[in-house]
Amino acid sequence: MQREKIAIAYSGGLDTSIMIKWLKDKYDADIVAVTGNLGQQKEIENLESKAIATGASGFHFVDLKKPFVEDYIWRALKAGALYEDVYPLATALGRPLLAKALVDVALEENCTMLAHGCTGKGNDQVRFEVTFASLAPHLKVLAPLREWEFTSRESEMDYAIKHNIPVSATKKSPYSIDENIWGISIECGVLEDPMVAPPEDAYQITTSPENAPNEATVVEIEFEQGVPVSVDGKKMAGLDIINRLNELGAKNGIGRLDMIENRVVGIKSREIYEAPAATILHFAHRELERLTLEKTVFQYKKNIAQDYANIIYNGTWFSPMRTALDAFVDDTQKPVTGMVRLKLFKGSVTLLGRQSPYSLYNESLATYTEADSFDHKAAAGFIQIYGLGLKTFSEVHPAK
């Protein structure tokens, strides 16, 4: 009888490290570990040897950086997608791509099951499993963290120690960290108390604003149809742009976020994020839209931004709704071309200037100097018509 084969999403962290042995023992199955590279800086080296030593029979390392930037991050940026107006969705954006990569490997390896290391009260279980259902509904899905005997990260670490499984978490510093090029999420430990300020050791890449340089960094970012194409006049690939802005932003203490957010499963959670490049690019992109988008489009697009952010956060990336919103967003971005100049200083991003060949700002209409070309006399008739409805209402319903 042919053995079962399980493809697991493997990060090398605590949960997925012990999951290899746990699944192998429980299902007497071959384990294929799949790691996707989304630009994370840590835990990439030696992952294959670690997975094999832990019990995996196969390992796939999939470089997803380019599609992550071009097909996911840029789409979210153009949409202005910030979950609950704060979170740039780094982890959430990566999940559908990682899930797709896992499905691709599972089909290639003739696996019968898929497994992920998401908790039973988190968002990621929804994101992975909804994607699995969208792309490979015939494959059985396993979620060990919803059924195994471990009740805390401490008990998981005890299991890892017992079976000589190397992990980076410790009982003294039990942070759960997820990282990709668009940002880092940090949770667990003392961070679960919303009144406790994040300890400095929780932050992975950003300098404390208080310790950031005393001299500001000025940066110019150029966009073409809503997509960043250069930094300080130098044309770059998307991946290089994000890396450069992460470097500049982190040095200047940009992108530290601390929020209480509403999870898909109905609970509130306290999340710490580091997202220097995302913070800078969303700010710059929004300011360029202010300059180039017609008023009603600019205002309505705020609603689309929230809808798009919810789609990403809630795990329905592979949906007709997202495809439909992309069509709207892409049309709005046709004039979003130009340059934005910013100042990065001790945790803050300040606008210094912006320009575009499609700018709707007309200085001769806006100025209060002798160059003013606005017809002031036209305002009287406009106001009379504009306020006619309220005037009529007040005549029927006089104020008391």
Swiss-Prot record:
E.C. code: 6.3.4.5
NCBIfam families per record: argG, PRK00509.1
Keyword match Phosphoprotein: no
Domain of life: Bacteria
HAMAP family named among the record's database cross-references: Arg_succ_synth_type1
Enzyme class per UniProt: ligase
InterPro entries: Arginosuc_syn_C, Arginosuc_syn_N, Arginosuc_synth, Arginosuc_synth_CS, Arginosuc_synth_type_1_subfam, AS_cat/multimer_dom_body, Rossmann-like_a/b/a_fold
Catalyzed chemical reaction(s): L-citrulline + L-aspartate + ATP = 2-(N(omega)-L-arginino)succinate + AMP + diphosphate + H(+)
Organism of this sequence: Chlorobium luteolum (strain DSM 273 / BCRC 81028 / 2530)
Associated pathway: Amino-acid biosynthesis; L-arginine biosynthesis; L-arginine from L-ornithine and carbamoyl phosphate: step 2/3
UniProt-recorded name of the protein: Argininosuccinate synthase
GO cellular component: cytoplasm
GO biological process: argininosuccinate metabolic process; L-arginine biosynthetic process; urea cycle
GO molecular function terms listed in the Swiss-Prot or TrEMBL record: argininosuccinate synthase activity; ATP binding
UniProt: L-aspartate binding residues: 119, 123-124
Binding-site residues, ATP: 9-17, 117
Subunit comment: Homotetramer.
